[in-house]
Swiss-Prot record:
Disulfide bridge map: none
DNA-binding recorded as keyword: yes
Binding-site residues, ATP: G641, P642, N643, M644, A645, G646, K647, S648
Domain of life the protein comes from: Bacteria
Keyword vocabulary terms for this entry: ATP-binding, DNA damage, DNA repair, DNA-binding, Nucleotide-binding
InterPro entries xref list: DNA_mismatch_repair_MutS, DNA_mismatch_repair_MutS-lik_N, DNA_mismatch_repair_MutS/MSH, DNA_mismatch_repair_MutS_C, DNA_mismatch_repair_MutS_clamp, DNA_mismatch_repair_MutS_core, DNA_mismatch_repair_MutS_N, DNA_mismatch_repair_MutS_sf
Protein's recorded name: DNA mismatch repair protein MutS
UniProt lineage: Bacteria, Pseudomonadati, Pseudomonadota, Alphaproteobacteria, Rickettsiales
GO biological process: mismatch repair
Gene3D superfamilies membership: 1.10.1420.10, 6.10.140.430, DNA repair protein MutS, domain I, MutS, connector domain, P-loop containing nucleotide triphosphate hydrolases
Chain's gene name: mutS
Length: 889
């Protein structure tokens, strides 16, 4: 950020015209924004903003005269086309400052003479985390703004969705911060600028660098945050909003302060923040969330994700709630079973589901409509949404009453049933005021019924029947003057006037006729009546539009008084949509109700991968189902077998079954018994982290380190090919050690797939580990995958067979077979006579080099994160290699 002096020097402020100086003054206070500067019917951009935006939007880069002897770069956006251009700016993470004219040029001239500059002011800053416009945000996903404060090893996170008036505060361990960020997926993250100098903490936000908004440290001070909260909610003490700790107060205050800056005069009406306990939800680490493709595929697309398969919701708010459910599975038995009861209720009443879905799909996005109404950004359609929702809510309740007794609603259905209400008073008010088939724009009027307001009816009469009023006045004047040829005319110089021929001018004797002009053939007059009519006609359209805005504000106020009930109604409709969706897909895809317990059970019978099943069903193929029983004596399954045989699919499908069960949905299986999983970890697939200079193996080790450090005995751990990114012996050693640690230290349920067949001997050493493999058919050197997981171990990898299926040249395959035979003939016996791998891998450890000792001396192990520790190991390795090279020279 430039100082004012540097800024003015850069843009040669003192050589600028008065209007350009006004632009530069406003731009100085909004240096981080693209400034859209209203000039008449256009938003104009200058200097660097013009260059950036013209390229981004494909606009013509023009020039607006000269400034300081140079062409002034300029491009423009028509004001009526703004909404079509804004999404592309916001999608690119640009902040956009909207600067409007606060007066007309005529008003400016009256105020300060001919050379006066029109008053302008930034009325709003659009950012990706604070927008509410339908055209700028995804309909079926939340749009979160977050603020984070880290104190010791706890991160306080506040996040809100301004478009739906949702506000949540949660504390998590700093070790779980990246997992939580991947769950929330905020569009903007507010951090203290002091974090810019803390590289270890800043590393936690590596994947969110483009979304960070740094604010001065005072934003986060407890005292300032406390005042901000009190002012925002108009309360005397912050105790009114719940038991917030000091860091939670800081994040709430930071969010509210940020909103006050960017929203200017249109302040959001967020509810009190909801304080959430992390223990009630399953933790899904960032890697698992990505690899399981819960809400998007690895390439970032919705199609092909789990969400795309299970989402048959029929409303936008229902789609958003399903997105939240899938991102945040529950981890508390009673809460999960309560949801499953609701799903079961609808599953047992499929005709009701069909009828409700037909009704619910008629409900507009009441949630976001209500939010825009509360922040004075309402469109006419938003009010229509409220009206429609009130009407349909009664029909939904009537439909539910066909299978429920109103006096005896099951407790688990109360949150759905009780908020369904009709408000005749509010409905009648909106129905009497609003026209049908409303447009999105409120600027030009035309959305209020004329019958609603006598004044509006008069103005519209003037607009649409002006010729009739002129004709009436003309006939009146002809009668009064006895001049049958009297006319009422109009031109651009005189406006409206009365005209009579010169020979009839003497007949006009009444003083109300004021002489205006005499021509060679006619004399022109005016009257107070005519001037009043002309003024009304000229201003009628503007006055009607302004009156409609006043009526709109009154209607919004009436809705605001019922906002709490309407918010509960929106939630009820969303829940109905989601649970009807669960019942619908469960019936369509042949899902079963899972049994959720508080123990460590895990017994899936004929489980399926629902995404792949849907994909291959389209090809008229059948999905091969598999059992998975992780009981005490086999809570770790070590799975061997060739690539492409279905190991990874099996791993993923069991994780997906757990997630679906714990969001309250039926699952793709014949039966499922699941002890609640508190954390789900997954290490599947290989990926370099090029941005941070980490190899595939380093990424794998960092992710594995996180899993080993954070898993509990209630977790589900899924590991695929641990150790493959290094030498064979190194890889076997790492995989072996990880298995032992999971078995004996963590003692959790685990699926562990590997190519290291040497590991199968661990089944005789680790009592809770059991070997499983993928069934194949090997006949005459021809390999067929049967995709069935069976007990036992693979005796070879079939890598060359897979290469053959992949289409490698025959000459390469034949040579590979020759080499394989030679290697198998000469390979060392890893297990030796006592089947103990550790003895066969003993190596002589040389003395530590001096530089390595110095590195180790400087370390403080208690302050190292797993990621930092691995980086240091690499540094030590490089140091050893360097010293060995120096000895050889």
């Amino acid at each position: 950020m430039l100082t004012q002096e540097d800024f003015r020097n850069k843009y040669q402020y003192h050589q600028a015209t008065p209007m350009l100086q006004q632009y530069l003054d406003i731009k100085f206070t909004h240096q981080c924004c693209i400034l859209l500067f209203r000039v008449g019917d256009f938003y104009e951009l200058f200097f660097d903003d013009a260059i950036v935006v013209s390229k981004l939007l494909g606009l013509v880069l023009a020039k607006k005269g000269k400034h300081a002897g140079q062409d002034l770069p300029m491009c423009g956006i028509p004001y009526h086309a703004l909404e079509s251009y804004l999404p592309r700016l916001v999608e690119q993470e640009h902040k956009v400052a909207l600067c409007e004219q606060l007066e007309s040029p005529e008003e400016a001239k009256k105020r300060n003479g001919y050379k006066a500059v029109v008053k302008r002011e930034v009325v709003r800053i659009l950012t990706s985390g604070t927008i509410t416009e339908e055209s700028l945000i995804k309909a079926n996903a939340p749009n979160y703004l977050a603020a984070i404060v880290i104190y010791k090893d706890i991160a306080s996170i506040g996040y809100c969705d301004v478009s739906t008036a949702e506000f949540i505060v949660i504390d998590v361990s700093i070790h779980n911060l990246t997992s939580e960020l991947s769950r929330i997926n905020p569009k903007e993250i507010i951090l203290s600028e002091s974090l810019q100098h803390n590289s270890s903490l800043l590393a936690l936000f590596d994947n969110y660098k483009q979304k960070i908004v740094y604010q001065v440290e005072s934003y986060f001070s407890f005292n300032k945050a406390q005042r901000t909260i009190q002012n925002y909610y108009e309360i005397i003490t912050i105790d009114s909003i719940g038991s917030l700790n000091s860091t939670q107060v800081s994040v709430v205050g930071a969010i509210l302060e940020y909103l006050s800056i960017v929203q200017k005069h249109s302040k959001s009406k967020l509810p009190f923040p909801q304080i959430v306990s992390y223990e009630n939800f399953m933790l899904i680490d960032a890697s698992a969330r990505k690899n399981l493709e819960l809400t998007s595929t690895l390439s970032g697309n919705l199609k092909g994700s789990l969400l795309s398969v299970i989402d048959a919701t029929v409303t936008n708010q229902g789609g958003r709630l399903l997105h939240k459910f899938l991102s945040t599975p529950l981890a508390e038995v009673n809460l999960i079973n309560s949801r499953l009861q609701i799903t079961d209720f609808f599953y047992q009443n499929l005709q009701l589901v069909e009828n409700l879905r037909e009704l619910v799909k008629l409900v507009p996005d009441i949630e976001r409509a209500l939010s825009r109404i509360l922040i004075a950004k309402a469109l006419p359609k938003d009010l229509e949404s409220i009206k429609i929702s009130l009407k349909i809510a009664l029909s939904i309740k009537k439909e539910l009453n066909k299978v429920l007794e109103e006096e005896n609603i099951p407790k688990y259905l109360e949150e759905i049933y009780n908020p369904l209400f009709g408000d005749d008073e509010l409905y009648d008010l909106l129905d009497s005021a609003l026209l049908d088939d409303l447009s999105n724009s409120a600027n030009d009027g035309g959305f209020i019924k004329s019958s609603y307001s006598t004044k509006l009816e008069e103005l519209r009469n003037l607009i649409y029947n002006s010729s009739h009023f002129i004709e009436q006045l003309k006939l009146q004047y002809r009668q009064e003057t006895c001049i049958e040829t009297l006319k009422i005319c109009h031109n651009n110089v005189w406006g409206m006037f009365i005209e009579v021929s010169s020979k009839n001018a003497h007949k006009i004797t009444d003083s109300k006729f004021v002489h205006k002009q005499t021509t060679t053939t006619a004399v022109r007059f005016t009257t107070t009546e005519l001037q009043t009519l002309e003024a009304k006609m000229l201003n009628a359209k503007t006055m009607a539009a302004a009156l409609e805005q006043e009526i709109l504000a009154e209607l919004c106020k009436a809705i605001s008084l019922k906002s709490e009930k309407l918010s509960h109604l929106a939630k009820s409709i969303s829940l109905i949509d989601v649970f009807c969706n669960f019942a619908y897909i469960s019936h369509e895809f042949n899902y079963c109700r899972p049994e959720i317990t508080s123990d460590l059970a895990f017994n899936i019978v004929n489980g399926r991968h629902t995404v792949i099943e849907k994909l291959i069903t389209k090809k008229h193929e059948s999905f091969i189902s598999n059992d998975c029983n992780l009981q005490n004596d086999q809570r770790i399954w070590l799975i061997t077998g060739p690539n492409m045989a279905g190991k990874s699919t099996f791993l993923r499908q069991n994780a997906i079954i757990v997630i679906l069960a714990q969001i309250g949905c039926y699952v793709p299986a014949q039966s499922a018994q699941i002890g609640v999983v508190d954390k789900l970890f997954s290490r599947i697939g290989a990926a370099d982290d090029l941005a941070s200079g980490q190899s595939t193996f380093m990424v794998e080790m960092v992710e594995t380190s996180v899993i080993l450090a954070q898993s509990t005995f209630r977790s589900l751990v899924i590991l695929d090919e641990i150790g493959r990114g290094t030498s064979t012996y190194d890889g076997i050693s790492i995989a072996w050690s990880c298995l032992e640690y999971i078995h004996s230290n963590i003692r959790c349920r685990c699926l562990f797939a590997t190519h290291y067949h040497e590991l199968v001997d661990l089944a005789s050493k680790l009592q809770s580990l059991k070997n499983f493999t993928v069934k194949i058919h090997d006949s005459n050197d021809k390999l067929s995958f049967l995709y069935k997981i069976i007990e036992g171990a693979a005796n070879k990898s079939y890598g060359i067979h897979v290469a053959e299926l992949a289409g490698l040249p025959r000459i390469v395959l034949n040579r590979a077979k020759e080499i394989l035979l030679e290697l198998e003939h000469n390979k060392a016996d890893i297990n030796q006579s006592n089947n103990n791998i550790t003895k066969s891998m003993d190596i002589a450890v040389p003395p530590y080099p001096v530089k390595t000792i110095e590195i180790i001396k400087q370390l403080n192990p208690d302050q190292l994160t797993p990621k930092e520790a691995l980086s240091i190991i690499y540094k030590i390795k490089n140091t050893i290699l360097l010293e060995e090279d120096e000895k050889m020279i």
